[in-house]
Every structure is written in C-alpha cells, then in structure tokens.
Amino acid sequence: MSAGALNSAGAVMHSTRLRTNEVAVALPEEGDASLFFVGKIRTPWKSRSDTPRQGSELGPLCTLEISEPWAVALKGVEAYSRLEILYWLHESPRDIVLLSPADDGEIHGAFSLRAPVRPNPIGTSIVKVERVSGNSIVVRGLDCLDGTPLLDIKPDRSLSKPLAPVRKSFSIPAA
C-alpha cells in the first residue's frame, strides 16, 4: 500500500482503494498531543510489503539512531537485555477505522488489531539489545520501515515487574 499526501494534522490521507467493507473517517484538523521524535530507526526494509508482520529476536540487526539532545538519555540503557521500542508508523493511513486485514470482507475495528493502520499509528516492539555504541543501539526484533521515526525507548517491563497471574475464571456479579 503506498502512502498518500499528509493533511494539515500530519495524517496520511488514504490514497488506495478501500477493501471490501472497510470504512474510513474524516480526520480532525488539530490534535491535542505533541510528540518529539527522539531519533530514527534503521532497518533493511524499504517497503511495507517487505516488512515482516512481527519482529523476531532472531531477525536482522537494526539500529536505533538517537538524535541530540536526547542521546544523553541513553545513560544506563546498556544494563538491559531487552527494550520496548515505540515508533511512529509514518506511512500508515490514519483514517481507516474498520479493516479487512486478509482482504476477505471480514471486518475488524482498528482497536482490535495490531495492524499499523490506526488513528494514532504508534508501533511497539520488544527488542533484544545486541550493543550500545555512542548515540546508537543495535537491536534485533523490529518490524518497521527504514527511516521510521523513533518515539521512545523503555526497559522491557516484563524484566522488572512480575506478570499478573492468569485468572482461572471471570464472572460478573449479579445485580
């Protein structure tokens, strides 16, 4: 799917046909959040069709290039073996809210999928850290295009916080 032009809200206007039963909405002109790109992600993938659906810790080496003045925030990151990476899926349409990911007419809401097509196209991956060098972190496990804007880096929360136990049952109290 090719990217379209940006509207005044910085949203990609969907430039290809919608799939059967998909629905797009008009986007608001202004947002209420301001994000800073802290760097750029370097990967081997130049097109969405080449990009894996999900990253793998066995995948190719990718590099997180941290821009100034944010590079100083890397202090201590080398202590972690895995990081959670948040990035802006800059070529994803933002106006499609009902999607048919398999192009089979079956519809799902954007919030019920991990697809890159969503109102706020924020991607997230848990990556394996290979090395930290200067303003760069070399990792494995990404699934985004080369040049993707980097939003944030966090230690993988599952390394420091125990996972919640699985509930054996769930019931709604009687009214």
Curated annotation (Swiss-Prot):
Pfam families for the chain: TrmO_N
List of residues binding S-adenosyl-L-methionine: 52-54, 90-91, 114, 124, 145-148
Domain TsaA-like: 35-165
CDD domains tied to this protein: UPF0066 (cd09281)
Domain of life: Bacteria
Keyword set, alphabetical order: Plasmid, S-adenosyl-L-methionine
Membership in a protein family: Belongs to the tRNA methyltransferase O family.
Name under which the protein is recorded: Probable S-adenosyl-L-methionine-binding protein VirR
Gene source species: Rhizobium radiobacter
Phylogenetic placement of the source organism: Bacteria, Pseudomonadati, Pseudomonadota, Alphaproteobacteria, Hyphomicrobiales
